[in-house]
């Protein structure tokens, strides 16, 4: 990782981790509370998702040949939202992220590790 981009990469890593943390909290709550989203904790987690996506929309750069760890983490977090919280319309919050994700998610490494894709034997 280039030293001049360490802070940028760590910022994206932190934001991606925050999205995943909030999303997992909502998923677990729904599984054990019959999908009741009226709990204030769930509302706080939902608000954190909205804020995180809005911030990331202004942070991501065009995809390059070798994306950094932060970009990969953001892509995984957004795909996790699609997979586990399909009712959360993060694309309605972000203007740049949907097209950015379309490009980075087409990388062979991300395509090969999507849920439901058969993994090659080792």
What is each stretch, according to the model?
Residues 58-66, 108-113:
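Surface-exposed helix-capping loop/turn segments at secondary-structure junctions
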Residues 92-115:
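C-terminal end-helix/capping segment
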Residues 2-6, 62-69:
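Structural motif
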Residues 65-86:
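GST superfamily/GST-like fold recognition
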Residues 1-40:
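GST-like domain detector, emphasizing the conserved glutathione-binding G-site
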Residues 40-58:
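Amphipathic alpha-helical packing segments from all-alpha helical-bundle domains
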Residues 21, 31-34, 81-91:
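Short helix-capping/linker segments at secondary-structure and domain boundaries
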């Amino acid at each position: 990782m280039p030293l001049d981009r360490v802070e940028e990469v760590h910022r994206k890593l932190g934001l991606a981790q925050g999205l995943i943390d909030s999303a997992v909290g909502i998923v677990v709550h729904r599984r054990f509370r019959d999908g009741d989203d009226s709990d204030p904790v769930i509302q706080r987690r939902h608000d954190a998702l909205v804020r995180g996506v809005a911030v990331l929309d202004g942070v991501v750069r065009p995809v390059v040949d070798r994306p950094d760890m932060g970009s990969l983490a953001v892509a995984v977090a957004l795909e996790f939202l699609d997979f586990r919280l399909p009712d959360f319309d993060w694309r309605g919050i972000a203007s740049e992220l949907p097209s950015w994700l379309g490009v980075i998610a087409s990388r062979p490494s991300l395509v090969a590790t999507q849920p439901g894709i058969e993994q090659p034997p080792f």
